[in-house]
Amino acid sequence: MTSTTPRAALTTSADAGRPALRVVGLRKRYGDVVAVDGLDLTVASGECFGLLGPNGAGKTTTIEICEGLTASDDGTVEVLGRRWDDDEHALRERLGIQLQETQLAEKLTVEETVRLFRSFYPRGRSVDEVIDLVQLGEKRNARVGKLSGGQKQRLALACAMVGDPELIFLDEPTTGLDPQSRRQLWDLIIELKASGRSIVLTTHYMDEAEKLCDRVAIVDHGRVIALGTPRTLIASLGAEHVVEFSSPGSEEVLRAEELEALDGIQSARLHNEEWALEVTELARAVPALLRELARRGLPLEELVTHSATLEDVFVSLTGRQLRDA
């Protein structure tokens, strides 16, 4: 008989008040490559925490060490108040893990797959409940090999949830999905948050982090370079908007300091012949920019504006676009 006893009731009194995850001084090398370089972070119980950064930043290595799948070279990792060498079996029963690439047996059906994963846990949720939760009820008898990419990702999430975990690791959960599938998966993660589960996810989609995460750590070259809520990190720019424009020839005659001297413009960066301006007031900055271009006889090829995002925070910290990092 399947037990659906809430995980909160299974947590020992010794765990009360402890963070879901604590990482101190984490280091990992692969030959001459430093994947993780003295990384520290703490995830509170019930928090959705995001590790953000480009491919190769060290996100996946960090999360695999936290999941007990990879050994670190140095540092301390405590998961739900315990270390992996204390009692790995008991700890693994309390976790849900969705890998960046989850290879499921393609000849099994959806129901058979979830039932298989349910058998790994002494307690958990019912197979039917989890299948319905990830909106695969109509596909319960379909073989995994016949599912779409988005459906396979939802099935992988079901396998991570079926043990009713206290802490769930999601590594790049929406990579490769179309926009509709991404949003469907976002809705499922939001439901998990509402249930009080602790979630650690990695992503290089800044909009995903802004939508889902209570706090984020921006990781670059194996280090945390910024930590906080999405709102506070964006506010740290000191600019509410970003103006991006291209003007042929401007990169040869304009300097960043000259643009920063214009009314309403806080900072200016040139990247691949395109300027990005952090501005405090669009109504002042855009007219000032247009006047300056006209004064210099420079043509305006394109101009777009958007509210400041975590992507802009990353660019401000590193001088690189996330997609180019």
Regions found by a protein language model. Name each.
Residues 2-4, 263-325:
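Non-catalytic connector elements of ABC transporters
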Residues 1-27, 320-325:
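ABC-family P-loop ATPase nucleotide-binding domain
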Residues 187-280:
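ABC transporter nucleotide-binding domain
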Residues 18-23, 28-226:
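ABC transporter nucleotide-binding domains
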Residues 84, 120, 248, 282, ...:
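Short beta->alpha junction loops/turns
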